[in-house]
Amino acid sequence: MAKHLFTSESVSEGHPDKIADQISDAVLDAILEQDPKARVACETYVKTGMVMVGGEITTSAWVDIEEITRETIREIGYVNSEMGFDANSCAVLSAIGKQSPDINQGVDREDPRELGAGDQGIMFGYASDETDVLMPAPVTYAHRLVQRQAKVRKNGTLPWLRPDAKSQVTFAYDQGKIVGIDAVVLSTQHSDCIDLPVLQEAVMEEIIKPVLPAEWLTKETKFFINPTGRFVIGGPMGDCGLTGRKIIVDTYGGAARHGGGAFSGKDPSKVDRSAAYAARYVAKNIVAAGLASRCEIQLSYAIGVADPTSIMIETFGTEKVSHDIIVDAVRQNFDLRPYGLIEMLDLLQPIYKKTAAYGHFGREEFPWEATDKVEMLRDFANFK
């Protein structure tokens, strides 16, 4: 591919779908703190004045779902009815059942190492050397824009900002290399007291310029800041939100394939989540080791079966050693059974609420972002 454009988007923690994701993962974390072996599939729906939390949970833990929900909304910043949503006054409904025993009998085993996959499915992981976090640049910078929006909202730099926001960044490439940013879109909810020209200038100076590298911005770069002219009604008052509806934002911004399974609200026995994390871990270590510049991993599973039904590795012609060597290195050095994924990445910890906004990948605080297999891979491939 010669010259081309590629675009990715992100949304803020105050976006309705992300509110739902964060509530689902906050419930998961609270349960895992008490019962690491719990089975959790927690879904959330939010709309004006109400939250519904439902799903299937089997656990010895007791958690206060209403208080967890309110505290999560409070932390995001919806604490005033003028915003259309208020953590202190919204209704919280709960509809929780237990995991089906038909599923459970296929997952749990006498030998925990033979833990079966919680469902069938396909999962992808990806890494690229175009950023320092080995992620595609468009989604990386889209996340950073809405993270910056939240920061200047919460620290009072721009006190008229409100929690809901979206970003979109279009990068220009030539022969696979970034040559600049073609377009930037940032839409942010705001109070009724701010004029559009003032908002646009403040967003440019306090959000966009501090985030996007100056060398990629040119006089041809197009900026669209609140292009509708008004964004006062937002959050759950503007749109309903559902868990699992931002799966491309959560992953690679469309730069890699996606198996279709969402992450939030699912315990690590669900390979939709744990295997996607493991696939990212494997791909990132391959790229960090220098064995390829780009790497995509596909894993697949059958419900109740421990071993993956397939492993596929694609390096897009960027491999520096034989493709067969890379495949052998992965098969012989990574345990990709559900138990192996959980042990390898220490996934029974209550770490998931932090993942539920601004992307699950490219953030060094998460264990699947470690590059601790680099030397092993280089030694195996005899690559120095």
UniProtKB/Swiss-Prot annotation:
ATP binds at H15, D164, A165, K166, R230, F231, D239, R245, K246, A262, K266. It catalyses: L-methionine + ATP + H2O = S-adenosyl-L-methionine + phosphate + diphosphate. It is found in: Cytoplasm. The keyword Metal-binding applies. InterPro entries: ADOMET_SYNTHASE_CS (IPR022631), S-AdoMet_synt_C (IPR022630), S-AdoMet_synt_central (IPR022629), S-AdoMet_synt_N (IPR022628), S-AdoMet_synthetase (IPR002133), S-AdoMet_synthetase_sfam (IPR022636). PROSITE patterns: ADOMET_SYNTHASE_1, ADOMET_SYNTHASE_2. K(+) binds at E43. Its cofactor is Mg(2+); K(+). Belongs to the AdoMet synthase family. HAMAP family: S_AdoMet_synth1. Homotetramer; dimer of dimers. Catalyzes the formation of S-adenosylmethionine (AdoMet) from methionine and ATP. The overall synthetic reaction is composed of two sequential steps, AdoMet formation and the subsequent tripolyphosphate hydrolysis which occurs prior to release of AdoMet from the enzyme. This is S-adenosylmethionine synthase. It comes from Photobacterium profundum (strain SS9). The lineage of its organism: Bacteria, Pseudomonadati, Pseudomonadota, Gammaproteobacteria, Vibrionales.
